[in-house]
From Swiss-Prot:
Family of the protein in this entry: Belongs to the actin family.
Subcellular localization, as worded in the UniProt entry: Cytoplasm, Cytoskeleton
Keywords: ATP-binding, Cytoplasm, Cytoskeleton, Hydrolase, Nucleotide-binding
Protein name, entry field: Actin, spherule isoform
Top-level taxon in the UniProt lineage: Eukaryota
Cellular component, GO annotation: actin cytoskeleton; cytoplasm
Source species: Physarum polycephalum
Signal peptide limits: none
């Protein structure tokens, strides 16, 4: 093994990167790639072919912005490669051929995607070794557990992922159709009804900020509708927006997807259904170790509400919800822990193994 391992957690909304053994990621930037809208004119005045992360955000007026990861799954590999290139060379300032790499993946990531990630790391970046791990499994590891159920809700996807002795149980992983981006869009819709229009990509970022600063989960939705108070939020241009029950109505989509016009179970019911798909002997361990992870679980009040609704499903079971601080990057922290273990080198796919077996080696070594 060459230098210390680089850990990259690629989320739909944010990319987190840093060195194994660190407590927090060194780099966090939006998972976006911007291409100039008018290519020829832009090139003449010295602009680049593409921009990544914060730089793409700052130039969003002249760029077409794209998220290469949607609902946790990569959908544009050229843009994804740009994000990794930016991560290594601009954010981390390392030569990728000198460092083993740990990448994270969404639960139920298609096999072809895992192979493509592996291929790009070895062929485009000449990594000496690499490993792929499921985000929720790393989040559980970050909480100091090997068995439990992780309720992971980020910007693009939410999942209930039961894990036994460090291995996810794929047959029982369930996806929830609401995540952070849905909350932001729903809040924008409600603000429009109040007469505040947020239409551009730039304005949507303001809505996201309002959500992150003011949103919360109501313990009792109907009661909260009667008693909710209003708050003011100052926009960058100095105007003031008044926000009332929108503060908790936006996060209610995690519990009542009908608000988004969908007919699917909310977070507590999906978590319960996931546990019930597992062997009866381990259910007690899952109910007793429910770990929240991902940025969307940072919304105040979520743990109490999940506890209340799960208890209604299973009144006799002891239910324990763990909401670690810093859980918006707990997958990265779990990756940092895993990649600093003395056994990590044996776990990795080496360049030699890749050259002998090709990308499909990832299914044998990373599970």
């Amino acid at each position: 093994m060459e230098g210390e391992a680089v850990v990259i957690d690629n989320g739909s909304g944010m990319c987190k990167a840093g060195f194994a053994g660190d407590n927090t990621p060194r780099a966090m930037f939006p998972s976006i790639v911007g291409h100039p809208r008018h290519t020829e004119a832009m090139m003449e005045i010295g602009h680049k072919h593409s921009y990544v992360g914060d730089e793409a955000q700052s130039k969003r007026g002249i760029l077409a912005l794209k998220y290469p990861i949607e609902q946790g799954i990569v959908n544009n590999w050229d843009d994804m490669e740009q994000i990794w290139h930016h991560t290594f060379y601009n954010e981390m300032r390392v030569a990728p051929e000198e460092h083993p790499v740990l990448l994270t993946e969404a639960p139920l990531n298609p096999k072809a995607n895992r192979e493509k990630m592996t291929q790009i790391m070895f062929e485009s970046f000449s990594a000496p070794a690499m490993y792929v791990a499921i985000q929720a499994v790393l989040s559980l590891r970050a909480s100091g557990r090997t068995t439990g159920i992780v309720l992971d809700s980020g910007d693009g996807a939410s999942h209930a992922v039961p894990i036994y002795e460090g291995c996810a149980l794929p047959h029982a992983i369930l996806r929830i159709d609401a995540a952070g981006r849905d909350l932001t869009h729903y809040l924008r819709l409600m603000l429009a009804e109040r007469g505040y229009a947020f239409n551009t990509t730039a304005e949507l970022e303001i809505v996201r900020d309002i959500k992150e600063k003011l949103a919360y989960v109501a313990l009792d939705f109907e009661q909260e509708m009667q008693t909710a108070s209003s708050l003011n939020y100052e926009l960058p241009d100095g105007r003031v927006v008044t926000i009332g029950n929108e503060r908790f109505r936006c996060s209610e989509v995690l519990f009542q997807s009908c608000f988004l016009g969908m007919e699917s179970a909310g977070i507590p019911e999906t978590t319960y259904n996931s546990i019930m798909k597992c062997d009866v002997d381990i259910r007690k361990d899952l109910f007793g170790n429910l770990v929240l992870s991902g940025g969307t679980t940072m919304v105040p009040g979520i743990a109490d509400r999940v506890q209340k609704e799960l208890t209604a499903f299973e009144p006799t079971m002891k239910i324990k919800i763990i909401a670690p601080p810093g859980r918006q990057y707990s997958a990265w922290i779990g990756g940092s822990i895993l990649a600093s273990l003395s056994t990590f080198e044996q776990m990795c796919i080496s360049k030699k193994e890749y050259n002998e077996c090709g990308p499909s080696i990832v299914h044998r070594k990373c599970f």
